[in-house]
């Protein structure tokens, strides 16, 4: 790996770290080490990184700001590319916004509200990056990324980079084409917003923030929603009805504030979280004959 690390540093692609604990890079504060973690300093650096990765036939993984993510205790082999400060550019052209995949969703929503640009009110309080939000079609309060995305610049598994339109992204509830049909990650996105009264936008965002603050445990280390909603029901409702709020395995605990959240109550391992997820699935299946499916992305180990 030393020659790979030196090559990456010689190309000045950004920060390069060895055996970096991914617990330092996830909102759940859980995760084993990455062999090599790279934080690119610009979009073009991603192409240089991929050239080196392919040259040495290394496995690679991309993460954002670490929300909606559970990294296994074994960590991740090969190269982990973290979209962060180097991919947080922002350009405004009329009502269209071009934003880097590493840009904070909350930061963008707040910034646009101050300019009287509407469309991101639903994102107030959503943790994570724009790249991750596009990848999973993040949403809340009756809206999601599919309603504002014009196109996205995607890095695919084979290392190629191209733009996909909204239609080509094949969005549905908390999914996109990037998850299975054409695995890839969003490096930057073009969003269509609209001008509205700044006071109205700010009021709606504050209402959404207050709702999250009062109903979801973001003051504790967590990944966000653990399960997809088994429509027409809600995952949190089923967990609560099953009496599972507060249930704990090791350091992982079902939040007492919201049933669809698992928090790191102290020293939790990924195994603790996985065991708790399976316990919740089994209990819900036995009590309500409903199969629960995870929304949180689980990566690392042999996955």
From Swiss-Prot:
It comes from the Bacteria. Its EC number is 1.3.1.98. Its cofactor is FAD. One of its GO terms (cellular component) is cytosol. Gene3D superfamilies: 3.30.465.10, UDP-N-acetylenolpyruvoylglucosamine reductase, C-terminal domain, Uridine Diphospho-n-acetylenolpyruvylglucosamine Reductase, domain 2. Keywords: Cell cycle, Cell division, Cell shape, Cell wall biogenesis/degradation, Cytoplasm, FAD, Flavoprotein, NADP, Oxidoreductase, Peptidoglycan synthesis. Pfam families: FAD_binding_4, MurB_C. Cell wall formation. Belongs to the MurB family. This is UDP-N-acetylenolpyruvoylglucosamine reductase. It comes from Bacillus velezensis (strain DSM 23117 / BGSC 10A6 / LMG 26770 / FZB42). The lineage of its organism: Bacteria, Bacillati, Bacillota, Bacilli, Bacillales. The gene is murB.
